[in-house]
Amino acid sequence: MAVLIAVMGSDRRYAFLAELLRAEGHAPVEPAEADLIVTSSPPPGGVPAGKRMAACGPRSAPEGHFDLLKDEEYLVDVAYMTAEGAISAAMNASEAMIADSDTLVIGWGRIGKALTELLLSLGAHVTVLTRRLSARGEIEVIGAHAVATDDAAEAIEGKRLVFSTPPALVLDEAVLRHAAQNARIIDLASPPYGVDLEAARALSLRAWREPGLPGRYCPEDAARAILAALRRGGVLDD
């Protein structure tokens, strides 16, 4: 028997997800009629009584509901989509190629790791800023250079591309004063964000945020990742 599913989301990945579900016999319906609500985050009014919900956005699902952010395979997929989208955004905004460029990646979480791997594969010289002493050996062994977060001001000097991933302010005015004028600085973090954009503007630096890259850069693959996670979680039958 087909599961009645409501898809609630504002970017194109949810339109693709609705089409994928329809192709499998799960015709999308309104939330009030649904057995399962798939959403980017819990709706403001809460989930209607008796409904199941799968959340795949930055806020966790309510207790007792399926949270895609607890699916490690999904999170790794999203990290690579985000990293590839961020590199695409950087290439579109830069007048130089990635190969042989001096690049700074801030953070060594899933997105930071994916970014570093992809940038190295393109021939970039990558420095990774991390708070974790234990991560430095892992960073160095893949061919990147590890620097402590406390040394951010020194690390940003001369970098053509800068990617900030952790949701903590690292690139404040004091650090940004050391950035090159031709730098492209991309904030990939969720709130409270990692770059002081107001300070960057005051210093005539080009810095901006790139939220929701999977839904904008590769929405069809992002939708397939959600569908696969729903299956792994037993929310949908194979």
PLM region spans:
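Glycine/serine-rich phosphate-binding loop and adjoining beta1-alpha1 elements at the start
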Residues: 2, 38-100, 229-230, 236
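Residues at the starts of beta-strands that form the adenosine-phosphate
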Residues: 4, 27-29, 33-35, 51, ...
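Residues in the short beta-alpha loop(s) of Rossmann-like NAD(P)-binding domains
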Residues: 11, 131-133, 189-191
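A short, well-structured beta->alpha microelement
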Residues: 20-36, 42-45, 148
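Rossmann-like adenosine-cofactor binding region
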Residues: 42-49, 139-215
